Amino acid sequence: MIRVIINEVREAIQEAFTCALHTNSGSFVLFLARGDYDHRLEGEQFANLDPKPSPYCLDYMLDAYKDETRDKFYIRYLNRRYKNDDFKYQGDDGIDDLCVEMMIYSHVWESEAFLKHLYRLSNIVSGKEFYDWDVSGLKFHGHPLIMETKERFKDACPKLYKIIDASYTGYIRDSFAHSLFNVDEDARIIEHIATESRTTLIFRD
């Protein structure tokens, strides 16, 4: 299963990158170069420097550094667990795997670095004229921005839109973050149990 998903994701990313290149090649180059705006370089400590450092940065690695440990963890975990053809959710280990998956899922959709990349790419493919250097004012932790970003891929990059639409569900993040879920291994379901609602998610090997 994971090999099929990997191929689908690769095709979707290739489609989005091709669209971005043809829509606004300048912004796409800045996107690939990790163009960002660092407000710290506007500080008074730089006032007497000549020339002053520019807050417009290329190869901005701070976001990558902040996200590096999580990135390495979930890639190692997925490769270790799901590349085996005989993988199954069974017993306590199966429940442990599901809990770790929900944690990884929550972290991905709460990752500011990941969402910044997705947001910038969505603006490029949807035809925004200028590159989004400074996105510091946006609230990245929340459902509205993710849904807004997803919709910008709908026409230009249908493959990526389909993947985001199928993979992002706000209640999974809420279930894990607020401990509002229960795994029923026999029925092969995860129940999200909130005060006013109950949602069932089916899982399979």
Predicted regions and their residues:
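Extended intrinsically disordered or low-complexity regions, especially N/C-terminal cytosolic tails and loops
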Residues: M1-E101, S167-Y168
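Flexible secondary-structure boundary motifs
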Residues: V100-G170
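Alpha-helical transition-metal enzyme core signature, strongest for iron centers
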Residues: D67-K72, H107, S111, R173-F176
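Histidine-centered, metal-coordinating catalytic motifs and their short helical/loop contexts
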Residues: Y161-I190
